[in-house]
Every structure is written in structure tokens, then in C-alpha cells.
């Protein structure tokens, strides 16, 4: 039984070139739905060398206050999709887009691990139930 599956972007699903954190958060936000207000969840968006979307995966779902992200699962999906870049994203149901020290530590750990595989962690984004978000790349925290 598979807990989570890689979602290939279908031919009728628009492939987009992601060049900014705002474009990334808008693209990823569509996968959350109403649960963004209740559960903390984590997704990864996989991109090719031209920063075009090639797939996404929900890698974790927790409770109101947190979720566990296993870097090995992130690496597995990145490798399986042959992605050149990954954007990691999770939400804060509280509505506070500020990264916690744990968010920053996890993002740096993901970046280091993916770099060993020649895969770039392009950003780590925190979404809220409103349109607010934080990009660790924009903050220089990656």
C-alpha cells in the first residue's frame, strides 16, 4: 500500500515555468484545498532544467501544529521524477508565515542532501490559509 504517490502533471494540466517564489506558491497552493486551515502538510514540486513543472507529491500530513518530513522521501520522489530542481512547501494553519528554527534547519538539511544528488532545492515556501507566504530563498535562508 502506498501512502503517497507521485503525481505526474497530465497533458491537460498546464505545465508552468516557475521563475519566482510567488509563481511557485500560487502553483502549489492549488493542491492544498480547504485542509490548509486544519492540517499542516508538506508538498514538493519537481522541475526540469528549464524550471518547468514535471510533477508534485504530497510527502507528509500532520496535525494543527506540525508534520514530520523525511528527507529520504523527498529524495526518492526527486530521483523518481528525474527532476533537476525541487521546491519544498508546507503550510502553517495558524496563519503565521514566519519560519520556525525547525523550518530553517529542515530546509538546509534538504538542500544539503539533494545537492549530493545533483538536485537543487530552489526554495522552501511556507503557506498560510490566507494569501500570505514566506520564501526562505527570498529571505536568504537557504
Q: What are the language-model segments listed below?
A:
Residues 24-30:
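Short Pro/Gly-enriched beta-strand edge/turn motifs at strand-loop
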